[in-house]
């Protein structure tokens, strides 16, 4: 019984040296930074752990809520003939960014607050979590996104189908290359922000500055949406794009769908490489 309680207490943060999203790094007893051990590729014992499934449920619920609120916001803008009468692009961007801020804050201590297969993929490449957990998270994120978009359609089917269902696509006037580039760079910004905001190295260097990781992550999502909504409607989250595409299920949603998987995964991989090879490889020793 004691072992189970300890397992639940640790939750997703089974490796105490690694820093979950949304929490401040600890370890002020020793100022010199120590490289945390990498996560194992496979960890069979995770499959028997309640914390493993609890984390997956948290990812499902968070992605469900993310799609529900954000797609509803898109529908509210789409149903009006005058964008001045709605929250407009800025409001959509705030909806996406604000929800990520809130949901990362809520789920950080349970699952790490990924809510995005691209973020999970980037953290996996950086050996922050096992392949077992990464695949489980991605499945739960996609299922949550499908359910979230499905509930929006259930409430407002006519508007949902008439307004494109919030599905991502390359907008007229832009090429597929433009869309792919926007997704790569946008996801790089997001995943790089995730790495930077949650790097335990900040504990040794900036221990006097409290950091709330969800804030810069949500703000990054907001800014990327402002920049790329006119190009692709902003994906940077394969689960978000898949959920809207499956529920809308028209050719418009599938023609360019590959862009919203390939682009985010390339962007996440580049951010992981940059963080691990360039940023984390620099010699570091804090001042006494």
UniProtKB/Swiss-Prot annotation:
A motif (NPA 2) lies at residues 237-239. The keyword Transmembrane helix applies. Residues 1-36 are annotated as: Disordered. The keyword Repeat applies. The chain crosses the membrane at residues 57-77, 92-114, 135-155, 177-197, 211-231, 259-279. Pfam families: MIP. Keywords: Cell membrane, Membrane, Repeat, Transmembrane, Transmembrane helix, Transport. A motif (NPA 1) lies at residues 116-118. InterPro entries: Aquaporin-like, Aquaporin_transptr, MIP, MIP_CS. Induction: By nitrate in roots. Expressed in roots with a circadian rhythm showing an increase at the end of the night period, a peak during the first part of the light period and then a decrease. GO terms for cellular component: membrane; plasma membrane. Highly expressed in roots and at lower levels in anthers and silks. One of its GO terms (molecular function) is water channel activity. This is Aquaporin PIP1-5. Water channel required to facilitate the transport of water across cell membrane. It is found in: Cell membrane. Aquaporins contain two tandem repeats each containing three membrane-spanning domains and a pore-forming loop with the signature motif Asn-Pro-Ala (NPA). It comes from Zea mays (Maize). Belongs to the MIP/aquaporin (TC 1.A.8) family. PIP (TC 1.A.8.11) subfamily. CDD domains: MIP. GO terms for biological process: response to water deprivation. The lineage of its organism: Eukaryota, Viridiplantae, Streptophyta, Embryophyta, Tracheophyta. Disulfide bonds: none annotated. PROSITE patterns: MIP (PS00221). It is a multi-pass membrane protein.
């Amino acid at each position: 019984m004691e072992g189970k309680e300890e397992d639940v207490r640790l939750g997703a943060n089974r490796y105490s040296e690694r820093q979950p999203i949304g929490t401040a790094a600890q370890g002020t007893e020793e100022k010199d930074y120590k490289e945390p051990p990498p996560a194992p590729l496979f960890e069979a014992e995770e499959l028997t752990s309640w914390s493993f499934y609890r984390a997956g449920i948290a990812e499902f619920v968070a992605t469900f809520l993310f799609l529900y609120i954000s797609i509803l916001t898109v529908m509210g803008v789409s149903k009006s003939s005058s964008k001045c009468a709605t929250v407009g692009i800025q409001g959509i961007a705030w909806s996406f960014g604000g929800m990520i801020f809130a949901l990362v804050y809520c789920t950080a201590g349970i699952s790490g607050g990924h809510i995005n297969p691209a973020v999970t993929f980037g953290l996996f490449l950086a050996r922050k979590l096992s392949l077992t957990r990464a695949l489980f998270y991605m499945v739960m994120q996609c299922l949550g996104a499908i359910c979230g978009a499905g509930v929006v359609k259930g409430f407002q089917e006519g508007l949902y189908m008439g307004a494109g269902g919030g599905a991502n696509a390359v907008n007229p006037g832009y090429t597929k290359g433009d869309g792919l580039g926007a997704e790569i760079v946008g996801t790089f910004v997001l995943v790089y922000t995730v790495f930077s905001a949650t790097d335990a190295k900040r504990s040794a260097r900036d221990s006097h500055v409290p950091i709330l990781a969800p804030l810069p992550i949500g703000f990054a999502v907001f800014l990327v949406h402002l920049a790329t909504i006119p190009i692709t409607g902003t994906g940077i989250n394969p689960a978000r794009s898949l959920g809207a595409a499956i529920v809308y299920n028209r050719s418009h949603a599938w023609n360019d769908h590959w862009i919203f998987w390939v682009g985010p995964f390339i962007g996440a991989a580049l951010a992981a490489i940059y963080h691990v090879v360039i940023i984390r490889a620099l010699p570091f020793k804090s001042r006494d």
